[in-house]
Swiss-Prot record:
Gene name, Swiss-Prot/TrEMBL: serS
GO cellular component: cytoplasm
Main EC class the enzyme belongs to: ligase
GO molecular function, one term: ATP binding
GO BP: selenocysteine biosynthetic process; seryl-tRNA aminoacylation
Enzyme Commission designation: 6.1.1.11
Organism encoding this protein: Klebsiella pneumoniae (strain 342)
Binding residues annotated for ATP, in chain numbering: 268-270, 355-358
Designated name of the protein: Serine--tRNA ligase
Function of the protein: Catalyzes the attachment of serine to tRNA(Ser). Is also able to aminoacylate tRNA(Sec) with serine, to form the misacylated tRNA L-seryl-tRNA(Sec), which will be further converted into selenocysteinyl-tRNA(Sec).
Pathway(s) the chain acts in: Aminoacyl-tRNA biosynthesis; selenocysteinyl-tRNA(Sec) biosynthesis; L-seryl-tRNA(Sec) from L-serine and tRNA(Sec): step 1/1
């Protein structure tokens, strides 16, 4: 959520910056609502003061033995007017809040301006895509060759965009997640967390999934109950529970940064992606991801973004997977982000780079929703923290890249040396 004071005092400047990301802010409506809020605020305060004064007069008149009925009727009328004004003010404030919750974050000044993914800017590349001297198989074909990816079984169990992994490929999938966690906790300074996969509405509001993206979530409720705000939703990313661990907290600045990681399944309805990536593991309703979250002082967040992106890059480098780093343009960034880097790994069967990590500085956008603050030891003043999140990495897509980049002419899949301790020394699958 943006700073309400900024929306009140500089709506035109905010609108100009939001326009860079293709969002049209209705400044006239905001101004009209703000003017009405001011009127109702003054009216409510005046009515409250008048009723208090008249109520005091009743006691004084009663002490003098005077007829208090006219004063009592007047106080009752003032009370009715006050209740009506309060009700209108509450309705108006709710409308303003709903508008504010639907406004995306302001892009950082150094984010490239653009409409969509075609306007993203490549920052760097690492590694050289392998030149194969045989016909490249995609990960689905390889998975079926080794009996490790069973999409038909998943359709029987659940439906499309799910998979059953078996045998050595299931083990490799687990090994990747363990390797990522070990790297982030032992070398990058993150603390490992195990978090709920179901979260409540407040948690989803805190990180920005609600109210705007309710349709992207899988919601749960007991069959005998009606859907309501007490129902849970499956997490779309571990960013949601990890970041909300600091909701309504005041953290000593000396305790920052807080760096957390977790390996979880992620659940997404993939609304709006019908027909895209229907084959294989690229776009699933359920997929595993190792997530990184940092809670930092405001002045440290831009440096933290570079650091976090480097942590995700390190995973790819140690696995020997070619990738490129891309700065997302204003029109392609996520709702809550003020600056984002995507890492795209080389997928040989598609002859292109595909997203495998997204690392974002969210500034104070989520912190304001969560009321997550830090306190300076010197002056004891509090201020909102900055939050960052990044994939470190998407495990299924890493498996795809590894299978395709390390495939052999006979269909075997070489295990990168760094993963072999997690695979009991296994060098090849197949």
């Amino acid at each position: 959520m943006l700073d309400p004071n900024l929306l009140r005092t500089e709506p035109d400047a905010v609108a100009e910056k939001l326009a860079r990301r293709g969002f049209k802010l209705d400044v006239d409506k905001l101004r009209a609502l703000e003017e009405r809020r001011k009127v109702l605020q003054v009216q409510t305060e005046n009515l409250q003061a008048e009723r208090n004064s008249r109520s005091k007069s009743i006691g004084q008149a009663k002490a003098r033995g005077e007829d208090i009925e006219p004063l009592r009727l007047e106080v009752n009328k003032l009370g009715e007017q006050l209740d009506a004004a309060k009700s209108e003010l509450e309705t108006l404030l709710a409308e303003i809040r709903d508008i504010a919750l639907a406004i995306p974050n302001i892009p950082h000044d150094d984010v490239p301006v653009g409409r969509d993914e075609n306007d993203n800017v490549e920052v760097s590349r690492w590694g050289t895509p392998r030149q194969f001297d045989f016909e490249v198989r995609d990960h689905v074909t390889l998975g079926e060759m080794h009996g490790g990816l069973d999409f038909a079984a998943a359709v029987k169990l659940t439906g499309s965009r799910f998979v059953v992994m078996k045998g050595q490929l299931a083990r490799l999938h687990r090994a990747l997640a363990q390797f990522m966690l070990d790297l982030h906790t032992e070398q990058h300074g993150y603390s490992e967390n195990y978090v709920p996969y179901l979260v409540n509405q407040d948690t989803l509001y805190g990180t920005g999934q609600l109210p705007k993206f309710a349709g992207d979530l899988f919601h749960t409720r007991p069959l005998e109950e009606e859907a309501d705000s007490s129902n849970y939703a499956l997490i779309p990313t571990a960013e949601v529970p990890l970041t909300n661990l600091v909701r309504d907290e005041i953290i000593d600045e000396d305790d920052l940064p807080i760096k957390m990681t977790a390996h979880t399944p992620c659940f997404r309805s993939e609304a709006g992606s019908y027909g895209r990536d229907t084959r294989g593991l690229i776009r699933m309703h359920q997929f595993d991801k190792v997530e990184m979250v940092q809670i930092v002082r405001p002045e440290d967040s831009m440096v933290a973004l570079e650091e976090m992106t480097g942590h995700a890059e390190k995973v790819l480098q140690l696995l020997g997977l070619p990738y490129r780093k891309v700065a997302l343009c204003t029109g392609d960034m996520g709702f809550s982000a003020c600056k984002t880097y995507d890492l795209e790994v080389w997928v040989p069967a598609q002859n292109t780079y595909r997203e495998i990590s997204s690392c974002s500085n969210v500034w104070d956008f989520q912190a304001r929703r969560m009321q997550a603050r830090c306190r300076s030891k010197s002056d004891k003043k509090t201020r909102l923290v900055h939050t960052l999140n990044g994939s470190g990495l998407a495990v299924g897509r890493t498996l795809v890249a590894l299978m395709e980049n390390y495939q052999q002419a006979d269909g075997r899949i070489e295990i990168p040396e760094i993963l072999r301790p997690y695979m009991r020394g296994l060098e090849y699958i197949g």
